């Protein structure tokens, strides 16, 4: 069993974006390829949780396993994706990553995993005053909590965090760059993110 593994969530419908965000162009590749390049530089084992509509396209782009949600919980949001990844790879801790935060840095995963310790169930960054539960780390013991929530048809990350002993980490305290956490939900945000990138 690995100590650390990574789970990339690419199962959302991207309805506000208008096309699958995982496949959006970014720095000569795609969001998903860029994010995986960053993650696999820090983590040996990474799995992508994909929407069935784009699974084959994602598989052609990446060199890591691409799976769908556990059938019983298919389409139940990020909790279903996280627990599906936990079932696929055995690890003590899982670094979670959405497919729509293309600015993420490998430094973030180093910082995040350094913050883990057995007394906590989760390590969640707070960036500009906002919790970022999808750019966080979760201990494998939360798997049972996720199953219990899904059984009760509860799907929110906030409901999971309320049941966990969470170590909240202020981005400023660990020298995390707020730009790493920018997520792209609309075409306007995508255009802005590309502009910001070209201005660097």
From Swiss-Prot:
Domain of life assignment? Bacteria
Q: Which organism is it from?
A: Bacillus anthracis
Q: What is its EC number?
A: 2.7.7.77
Stated name of the protein: Probable molybdenum cofactor guanylyltransferase
Similarity annotation: Belongs to the MobA family.
Instruction: List, in alphabetical order, the Gene Ontology terms for molecular function in this entry.
Output: GTP binding; metal ion binding; molybdenum cofactor guanylyltransferase activity
Q: Which key words are in the record? A: Cytoplasm, GTP-binding, Magnesium, Metal-binding, Molybdenum cofactor biosynthesis, Nucleotide-binding, Transferase
**Main location group:** cytoplasm
- Kindly give the HAMAP family that the UniProt entry links to this protein: MobA
Give the residues the record marks as binding GTP: 9-11, 21, 69, 100
Alphabetical list of Gene3D superfamilies matching this protein = Spore Coat Polysaccharide Biosynthesis Protein SpsA, Chain A
Cofactor dependency: Mg(2+)
**Any one GO BP annotation for this protein:** Mo-molybdopterin cofactor biosynthetic process
Q: Which reaction does it catalyse?
A: Mo-molybdopterin + GTP + H(+) = Mo-molybdopterin guanine dinucleotide + diphosphate
Report the domain remarks: The N-terminal domain determines nucleotide recognition and specific binding, while the C-terminal domain determines the specific binding to the target protein.
Question: InterPro entries under this entry?
Answer: MobA-like_NTP_Trfase (IPR025877), Molybde_CF_guanTrfase (IPR013482), Nucleotide-diphossugar_trans (IPR029044)
What is the recorded function of this protein according to its Swiss-Prot or TrEMBL entry?
A: Transfers a GMP moiety from GTP to Mo-molybdopterin (Mo-MPT) cofactor (Moco or molybdenum cofactor) to form Mo-molybdopterin guanine dinucleotide (Mo-MGD) cofactor.
């Amino acid at each position: 069993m690995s100590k650390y593994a990574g789970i990339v969530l690419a199962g959302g419908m991207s309805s506000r974006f208008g096309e699958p965000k995982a496949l959006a162009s970014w720095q000569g590749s795609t969001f998903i390829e860029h994010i995986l390049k960053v993650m696999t530089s820090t983590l040996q084992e990474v799995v992508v949780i994909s929407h069935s509509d784009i699974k084959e396209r994602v598989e052609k782009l990446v060199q890591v396993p691409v799976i769908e949600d556990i059938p019983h919980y298919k389409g139940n949001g990020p909790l279903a994706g996280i627990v599906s990844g936990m079932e696929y790879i055995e690890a003590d801790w899982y670094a979670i990553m959405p497919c729509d935060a293309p600015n993420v840095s490998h430094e973030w995963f180093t910082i995040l995993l350094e913050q883990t310790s057995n007394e906590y169930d989760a390590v969640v960054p707070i960036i500009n005053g906002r919790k970022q539960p999808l750019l966080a780390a979760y201990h494998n013991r939360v798997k049972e909590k996720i199953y219990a929530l899904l059984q009760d048809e509860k799907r929110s990350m906030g409901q999971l965090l309320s049941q966990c002993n969470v170590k909240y980490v202020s981005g400023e305290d660990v020298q995390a760059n707020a730009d790493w956490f920018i997520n792209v939900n609309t075409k306007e945000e995508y255009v802005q993110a590309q502009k910001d990138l070209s201005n660097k």
